Amino acid sequence: MFEVEQIKGIIFDYGGTIDSNGEHWAWVIWDAYQAHEVPVSKEQFKEAYVHAERFLATNLVILPEDNFHVLLQKKIKIQIEYLIDKGFLTEGKKTEEYSIGISKQCYTFAREIISKEIPLLKSLKEKYPMVLVSNFYGNVQAVLGDFKLLDFFDQIIESAVVGVRKPDPKIFTLGVEALGLPAESIVVIGDSYEKDIIPAQKNGCKTIWLKGQGWGKDNESATADVVITDFVKLEEIFKLS
């Protein structure tokens, strides 16, 4: 049972939670592909998306100083290059415009989402210590700084820095240790059942699942202490209003 009165600290996921209100970033980017009328199928896009993620995980492309707009420009460029290499797209001026337009649309999407959440995050910060635990590319500090989010978190646990990635429960153990509180008095808030909720539960934390359009199908039995479909519902859960 989730009793907010027992909560003394909060661990937040970042990507897919704070910056997209539960929607997997693959689908945010796919929506931008469609808006820019990129002539590829959803399956071709998924191939390119996976390729880019794997490439970024194994190559030093994202620099520590890159904000989210720069990150997106680099990521979309890799996707477009893959689609050209595979013969799904024909290289030309239009393909250059795709990278620019899609990255701008996605960055604007994130900025608008976050701007609506900042008052809520400020209210939470006034009541609770908060730690961020994120699988990211080594530039999450620059991303948070650009979005004016850095001051909300007492500590940031980033996979590329600590050498542990979700769904390994150890990365959440680091978050619990950073808060210095009993795990049962900490709630983890994230959008991924596999990468956030399960490892948080293994640490003994309470969980709030921001359930949106994920990458694949969720296990039908998947659950958390609280399930929400909109970030702003946290205001009600934490009795902030």
Label each residue range with its predicted role.
Residues 1-10, 43, 90-93, 118, ...:
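Asp-based, Mg2+/Mn2+-dependent phosphohydrolase catalytic module
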Residues 126-127:
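Structured helix-beta-strand junction loops
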Residues 3-118:
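N-terminal helical cap/lid subdomain that shapes the substrate entry/recognition surface
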